């Protein structure tokens, strides 16, 4: 195995300037921001932007293994600015080639692209501000970039570690949020990966998601085929709102509930996608946001990028399934959680994913389509497909896959009511 590489360098990125933060305190007790408090003291607010673009130098930290390459920008909130799939030679999160802020964030400036980490509320107050960082090497050849800060509104501390391991085609993210105060504090955590929009985009929600909510659960729609009115759009003819091209206005939707640990997006015109994996018991939030496939959405595209086109926000919530919704930290309490972001290819719309593998099993005009994509090495495994209630397997083959590779096929001439697909090895079932 090749050890993970980590390095620091200055990178030059075309950047649009902002005005200065207001030096005067703003006691905005009655300000409402995205359904929650807009009070930001002791932070200052920036309310001016510039059309002046310069080539600006930014501190970047890179992680790279045999499968993916990731760039983190500590000077912009510690966000993942770029994530590159080395196997498919594609950005598996939306890469904005310019830093072009708009007044979207809690303190004003906010940029699209990459993976943003929203806390203690969204959009993160320090999303356009620097954070501390350090590097950690592991005995197994893995490398971690830690970023962290103490935010000033609630006095909470956060540390987030971005880890690549030599034998895994996934970015592992481990976070710790600590309340060092003598009284309870509240916070939320929504990771916000951006993915490419356009005609080829389709969101990949788990198969048990049949309904989605708006913010505050104030409106509901069937999913993926909407059949009523949602965001004042008439979908009564039956419209697949998992497709970017079918959503004409700015729209949020969040899964009502799911027993699955994944959510993602598939790009039909690139044969590649992104998946997020986390324990659904603590990470139930699964959301899509779009500016809409219309002139209004195109205007926002131009406000946030020069040439990279539309994007989708595919937000993933910890301790919350809707926005705004908060969890509590008791005095001196710490909460920890893990998330995984990974590229995949070949399988298209998938039905399950874990930290080690991605599964496809669906009916189509071709028959029963099945597939398996490896995130970690799958050697000495078997893949079995069975009809529930019957002993004989419809498929039972040996599997030997290296990370970032896939196998797939079609079962013809059968029409079972319910099927199971299970990869397993000497150590048991895949996690």
Model-derived segments and spans:
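Exposed aromatic-hydrophobic patches
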Residues: 396, 403-413
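Surface beta-strand/loop "capping" patches
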Residues: 347-378
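Short, hydrophobic/aromatic beta-strand segments
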Residues: 183-189, 350-351, 380-384
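Short, aromatic- and glycine-rich surface loops/edge beta-strands on solvent-exposed regions
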Residues: 383-384, 412-430
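Beta-strand-rich binding/interaction modules
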Residues: 367-397, 419-421
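Asparagine-centered strand-capping/turn motif at beta-strand->loop junctions
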Residues: 176-183, 372-374
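A contiguous, surface-exposed recognition patch within enzymatic or periplasmic domains that forms
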Residues: 2-5, 9-26, 61, 68-71, ...
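Extended, loop-rich substrate-binding clefts of extracytoplasmic carbohydrate-active enzymes
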Residues: 26-64, 112-169, 199, 298-327, ...
């Amino acid at each position: 195995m090749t050890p993970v590489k980590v390095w620091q360098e200055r990178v030059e990125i075309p950047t649009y300037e902002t005005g200065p933060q207001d030096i005067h305190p703003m006691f905005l007790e009655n300000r409402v921001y995205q359904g929650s408090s807009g009070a930001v003291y002791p932070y200052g607010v920036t309310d001016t932007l510039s059309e002046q673009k310069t080539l600006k130098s930014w501190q970047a930290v890179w992680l790279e293994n045999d499968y993916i390459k990731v760039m983190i920008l500590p000077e912009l909130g510690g966000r993942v600015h770029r994530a590159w799939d080395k196997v498919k030679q594609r950005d598996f999160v939306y890469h904005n080639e310019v830093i072009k802020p708009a007044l979207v964030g809690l303190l004003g400036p906010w940029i699209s692209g990459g993976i943003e980490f929203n806390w203690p509320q969204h959009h993160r107050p320090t999303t356009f501000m620097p954070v501390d960082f350090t590097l950690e090497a592991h005995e197994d050849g893995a490398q971690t970039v830690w970023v962290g800060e103490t935010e000033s509104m609630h006095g909470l501390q956060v540390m987030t570690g971005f880890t690549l391991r030599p034998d895994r085609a996934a970015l592992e993210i481990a976070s710790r949020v600590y309340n060092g105060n003598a009284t309870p504090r509240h916070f939320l955590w929504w990771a916000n990966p951006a993915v490419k929009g356009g005609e080829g985009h389709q969101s990949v929600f788990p198969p048990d998601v049949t309904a989605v909510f708006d913010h505050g659960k104030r409106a509901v729609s069937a999913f993926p085929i909407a059949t009523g009115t949602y965001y004042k759009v008439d979908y009564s003819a039956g419209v697949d709102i998992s497709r970017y091209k079918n959503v004409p206005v700015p729209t949020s939707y969040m899964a009502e509930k799911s027993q699955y640990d994944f959510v993602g997006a598939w790009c039909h015109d690139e044969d590649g996608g992104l998946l997020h994996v986390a324990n659904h018991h603590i990470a139930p939030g699964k959301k899509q946001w779009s500016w809409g496939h219309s002139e209004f959405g195109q205007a926002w595209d131009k406000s946030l990028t020069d040439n990279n086109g539309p994007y989708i926000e595919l937000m993933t919530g910890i301790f919350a399934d809707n926005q705004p919704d908060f969890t509590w930290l008791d005095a001196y309490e710490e909460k920890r959680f893990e998330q995984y972001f990974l590229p995949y290819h070949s399988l298209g719309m998938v039905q399950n994913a874990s930290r080690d593998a991605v599964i496809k099993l669906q009916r189509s005009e071709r028959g029963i389509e099945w597939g398996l994509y490896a995130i970690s090495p799958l050697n000495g495994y078997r893949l079995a497909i069975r009809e529930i209630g019957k002993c004989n397997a419809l498929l039972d083959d040996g599997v030997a896959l290296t990370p970032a590779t896939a196998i797939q096929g079609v079962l013809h001439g059968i029409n079972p009511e319910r099927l199971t697909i299970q990869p397993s090895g000497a150590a048991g079932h895949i996690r």
